[in-house]
């Protein structure tokens, strides 16, 4: 029963046709990927559930109860498919329209990011160039000292370390200067990007189209509930005979077992 409830819930949430991922020629949106995954999962649940029902009916207890679960399971699957067909077009059309209406926001944000990237790139290139130059200069200064270290005796190690220390400090100071310079150069662009992003979010929040979609979403959910109610009622009616039969048969088995124990 848990598998049945999960299957119905997933169908209600996705409301899509059984479109498989490998049948798509064009790139899929995130919503399409979620719907495809849900459909594959629902199909797997239905198939595995039918296998369990078939195995139970084949068992000695299932044959004794004679519940006709497999037939009822197929009826349940048909009812679920009908529910999916009723809800699919309405839900798919709503989300597709919402994605189209908000596409301009993504385009504007990508445009802003590209503009900032073009402005910042020269500073990054200059920083990388200076970094490489200083690393090469440091390597040239250290190389002779390293050779001298190999040739000198242990007693000159401290003297050599003293000579290396100023070079390392000079390199560190130069790197700090470059980093501070880069931070100063990038600061206006970072602030500009934050302001641009805040502006885009404000535009998105105040956009009348999205406000309209908020209202339409409420209407859509209400309509969806009204359309789903008959299908769910049919599903409930399909399950009730099976549950009542199961309850009666199980009670009969319990009564017989009680009579047997009493007789002993």
Curated annotation (Swiss-Prot):
One of its GO terms (cellular component) is extracellular region. It comes from the Eukaryota. Sequence repeats lie at residues 67-88, 89-110, 111-121, 122-143, 144-165, 166-187, 188-207, 208-229, 230-240, 241-264. It is found in: Secreted. Keywords: Cholesterol metabolism, Glycoprotein, HDL, Lipid metabolism, Lipid transport, Lipoprotein, Oxidation, Palmitate, Phosphoprotein, Repeat, Secreted, Signal, Steroid metabolism, Sterol metabolism, Transport. Glycosylated. Palmitoylated. Residues 67-264 are annotated as: 10 X approximate tandem repeats. Residues 1-18 form the signal peptide. One of its GO terms (biological process) is negative regulation of interleukin-1 beta production. The modification Methionine sulfoxide is found at residues 109, 193, 240, 242. Major protein of plasma HDL, also found in chylomicrons. One of its GO terms (molecular function) is lipid binding. InterPro entries: ApoA_E, Apolipoprotein_A1/A4/E. Homodimer. Interacts with APOA1BP and CLU. Component of a sperm activating protein complex (SPAP), consisting of APOA1, an immunoglobulin heavy chain, an immunoglobulin light chain and albumin. Interacts with NDRG1. Interacts with SCGB3A2. Interacts with NAXE and YJEFN3. Participates in the reverse transport of cholesterol from tissues to the liver for excretion by promoting cholesterol efflux from tissues and by acting as a cofactor for the lecithin cholesterol acyltransferase (LCAT). As part of the SPAP complex, activates spermatozoa motility. PANTHER family: APOLIPOPROTEIN, APOLIPOPROTEIN A-I. Belongs to the apolipoprotein A1/A4/E family. This is Apolipoprotein A-I. It comes from Mus musculus.
């Amino acid at each position: 029963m848990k598998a049945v409830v999960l299957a119905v819930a997933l169908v209600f949430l996705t409301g899509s046709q059984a479109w498989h991922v490998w049948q798509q020629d064009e790139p899929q949106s995130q919503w399409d990927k979620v719907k495809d995954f849900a459909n594959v999962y629902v199909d797997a649940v239905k198939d595995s559930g039918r296998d369990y029902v078939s195995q139970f009916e084949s068992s000695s207890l299932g044959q004794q109860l004679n519940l006709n679960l497999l037939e009822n399971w197929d009826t349940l699957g048909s009812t679920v498919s009908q529910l999916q067909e009723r809800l699919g077009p309405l839900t798919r059309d709503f989300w597709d329209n919402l994605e189209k209406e908000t596409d301009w926001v993504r385009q504007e944000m990508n445009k802003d990011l590209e503009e900032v990237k073009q402005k910042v790139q020269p500073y990054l290139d200059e920083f990388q160039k200076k970094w490489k130059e200083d690393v090469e200069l440091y390597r040239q200064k250290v190389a002779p000292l390293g050779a001298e270290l190999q040739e000198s005796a242990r007693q000159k190690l401290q003297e050599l370390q003293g000579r290396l220390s100023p070079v390392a400090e000079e390199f560190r100071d130069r790197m700090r200067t470059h980093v501070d310079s880069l931070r100063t150069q990038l600061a206006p662009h970072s602030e500009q990007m934050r302001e641009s992003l805040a502006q885009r979010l404000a535009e998105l929040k105040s956009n009348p189209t999205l406000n309209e979609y908020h209202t339409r979403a409420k209407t859509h959910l209400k309509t969806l509930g009204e359309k789903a109610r008959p299908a769910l009622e049919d599903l409930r009616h399909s399950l009730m005979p099976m549950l009542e039969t199961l309850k009666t048969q199980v009670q009969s088995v319990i009564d017989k077992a009680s009579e047997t124990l009493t007789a002993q």
